[in-house]
Amino acid sequence: MKLFKFLIILFFLNSCSFDNKTGIWNNENKISDDKQNQIFKDFKKISSSIKTFNENIPLKKNFKFNLDKSVNNVSWQDYYFDSNNNLKNFKYDNLNQVVLKSKKLSKYELNDYFLYNNNNVILNDLKGNLIVYSLTEKSIITKFNFYKKKYKKIKKLLNLIVEGDIIYVSDNIGYIYAYNYKINQIIWAKNYKIPFRSNLKLFSNQIVASNQNNDLFIFNKISGNLKKLIPSEETPINNSFINNIVLNENNIIFLNTFGSLYSVNKNNFNFNWFLNLNETLDLNISNLYIGSKVVCNKDKIFLSSKNNFYILQSKNGRVVAKKNFSSELRPIIYMDYIFLITKNNFLLAMNASNGKIIYSYDIKEKVADLFNFDKKKLEIKNFMLVNGNIYIFLKNGNVIQLDIRGEINQIIKLPSTLDSFPIIVDRLLLYLNKKNKLILLN
């Protein structure tokens, strides 16, 4: 019922823009059954099933990529690196020598994501422990647990973001809080009872989060007070996909578990536009929305739904390109190019303006042909741009290094398996292994 009412309201607000010219703000119109049906009709039109892309497209011999120099990154304060959820071309010494291997950081399962701030690695485990490991002292300098005994048996799924000495945390119990790890003190804490289910974003003095009911929250990051609550469609059941929040220059871009993408003005928190990317409104366990993280770059938005990859205009949500392939990994937008690994393991380079494919290669076939590599062992954890090359990190600890043209240079064997999403800071590669130890390579 909540979903039905919400869709009616959204139709009233005009599905692509929110102006004051039509009289809708003065209750001058009522929505008929035909118009209600049109809402559902439009939602279904947005995404249609097409045969999945499965084609090798070689790079034209005369094509030249325009690349900037790699950057020496010095911090990783956001799970997805920055407010745009986009990665850079990182500088890495590429010696692949172990600089540091920590002791076991926790006896409990650690989060796949961790942060880096002021020479400290910040991570958490399922017991709710916040752990700060100093690379200078080569030891844990802070270990803090916010939770009381009554939550002892609950697995705590925490979402972190750090700014200065403050770690901001939301969880699956309904708490959101700010913790100063330098003085070991809670700054503020609020309990909203409903589990939070999204990454966190910071801008100005605000912190943005979302819960499992697909409500979008904007808090004052100094006091923790709620500034704005924006409801959206609620899904009765959830899968592994969680709400995703990304910021561009003027707007909050919010993708919820119903498959709806919203643009919200950062200054007045009004809707700019919305778009539904789900393929069906029949929500059951077999057809729940699933897709990639959203990435913003310049005036475009990039993301995958279950079966399609989209390029959208950030100003109005207009579809610039829709492709018949999809990815669970977020794309990397670099210069004028998109780099993407599809669900069926094709590496693609595309034009970021129009989505035109520059090249497409079956990674499994390339690796198997060159290195007699078992295709079944090619389970991709993540990929990054490093020193102008493409590094594909496999779960078994191998790294496939390709040049920017999609040709394999080598396969690197890491000293241990990969159990987290790797990061690169200060020209070092950092990751957690399956024994909950931090590994640093130069």
Regions found by a protein language model. Give the residues of each.
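Bacterial Sec signal peptide processing site at the extreme N-terminus
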Residues: F12-F53
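Blade-level signature of beta-propeller repeat domains, shared across WD40, Kelch, NHL, RCC1
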Residues: S416-N442
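Extracytoplasmic beta-rich repeat domains
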Residues: N73, Q97-L115, S139-I161, Q185-S204, ...
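Short loop/turn segments that connect beta-strands within beta-propeller blades
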Residues: S134-K138, N180-N184, N220-G224, N265-F269, ...
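Blade/loop signatures of beta-propeller domains
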Residues: Q38-I57, N62-V99
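Loop/turn-rich, solvent-exposed surfaces of beta-rich toroidal or solenoidal domains
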Residues: Y334, L340-M350, K356, Y361-L402
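WD40 beta-propeller blade core
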Residues: I131, Y177, F217, Y262, ...
